[in-house]
Structures are given as structure tokens and as C-alpha cells.
């Protein structure tokens, strides 16, 4: 099954290309989850978090997890991606999600260089801003160049990292930390 097998692509090349395509697919899924209202209702659980730390990387609605798995499975099957490439991709994706959601500061000169290739915590923190223009930016998890390529990159938050508001303006307060409240969020109006 899959394009790599149909065209007899060497396993190493297939693995590298699969990794890059899967990363683009996850970036695209993230963009679409912000742009399509039904998917945003589900994804906003992730953005309702008023903090920005490792737990934010794990804060996804079960419906979003299922949809993401189906999307990635479709890509994997269509490509005929090598199993080892998929395993490596998932390990890197989860590790990078924890890294770029970490409430950590990398020295600015180092961050400037790193973010040309990978998503850094400061780069992704902009995406969790309560400012809509900033929320709709910096969608990447692994590679940062997708945002530059498709003009969704924002360098710094308008208010600066120390003064920016994290989360969504419509969902502030202690309720956002309640598991049952967040699980019901896709079914709430607005």
C-alpha cells in the first residue's frame, strides 16, 4: 500500500520524506483547527489554558485526539510510510510538543538561531496569546519553517512575553482548570 511502495522508494528516503510530510500534515491540521468553526470549538480547550507549561502540551479534547489520529493514519496509509519513520515522528512530535509548551526561556541569541529550524517555547508562546492575531500564528510543533513559508509567523507578542495574556479572553478564571468544564467546552456556545 501507499505511494512509497508503488514507486519503490528506498526505505531511508521514504522515512525522511514521510517525516517531513507528516510534520506538514500536523501543521496543516493545526491551521484548519483554528479556521474551521466546528474544529475550533474542539481545539479551543487547548487554548483555554491560562498557563503555558508542560501540561498545556497534553491538554487536548479526546475528540481532537481521535480526529488527529484519523488524519495522520490517512497520510501514513496514503504514503505507505515506513513504520519506523512513523514511530520516530510520533516520539519527536510528542517531545517537541512538551519542549515548545515548556515555560522555559532560551537565551534570545540562541532562540533566534534555533527558531529558523525548530519551534521554540518563546515562538510557540506567541500562539497561546489572548490576542487573536497572535493566536492565529506560529502553528508548528517540530519545524518552524512552515509558518515562515505560509506567512503565519509572528516573531514576538505585542505585549512582550512577560506582560502578554495567555489563554482566550472569553475563557478566563478558575473554571478553565476544571476537567469537566473543559471537556464540555466544545458543546458550549461561542
Tell what function each PLM region has.
Residues 3-162:
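Membrane-embedded catalytic scaffold of the fatty acid hydroxylase/desaturase
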Residues 161-190:
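A membrane-cytosol interface segment of integral membrane proteins
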Amino acid at each position: 500500500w501507499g505511494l512509497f511502495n508503488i514507486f519503490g522508494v528506498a526505505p531511508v528516503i521514504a522515512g525522511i520524506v514521510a517525516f517531513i510530510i507528516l510534520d506538514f500534515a500536523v501543521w496543516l491540521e493545526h491551521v484548519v483547527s483554528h479556521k474551521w468553526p466546528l474544529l475550533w470549538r474542539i481545539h479551543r480547550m487547548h487554548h483555554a489554558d491560562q498557563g503555558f507549561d508542560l501540561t498545556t502540551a497534553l491538554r487536548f479534547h479526546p475528540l481532537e485526539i481521535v480526529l488527529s489520529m484519523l488524519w495522520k493514519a490517512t497520510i501514513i496509509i496514503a504514503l505507505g510510510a515506513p513504520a519506523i519513520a512513523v514511530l520516530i515522528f510520533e516520539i519527536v512530535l510528542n517531545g517537541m510538543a512538551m519542549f515548545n509548551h515548556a515555560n522555559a526561556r532560551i537565551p534570545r541569541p540562541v532562540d533566534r538561531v534555533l527558531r529558523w529550524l525548530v519551534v521554540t517555547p518563546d515562538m510557540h508562546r506567541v500562539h497561546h496569546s489572548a490576542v487573536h492575531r497572535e493566536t492565529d500564528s506560529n502553528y508548528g510543533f517540530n519545524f518552524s519553517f512552515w509558518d515562515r513559508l505560509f506567512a503565519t509567523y509572528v516573531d514576538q507578542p505585542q505585549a512582550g512575553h512577560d506582560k502578554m495574556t495567555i489563554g482566550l479572553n472569553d475563557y478566563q478564571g478558575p473554571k478553565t482548570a476544571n476537567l469537566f468544564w473543559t471537556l464540555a467546552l466544545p458543546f458550549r456556545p461561542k
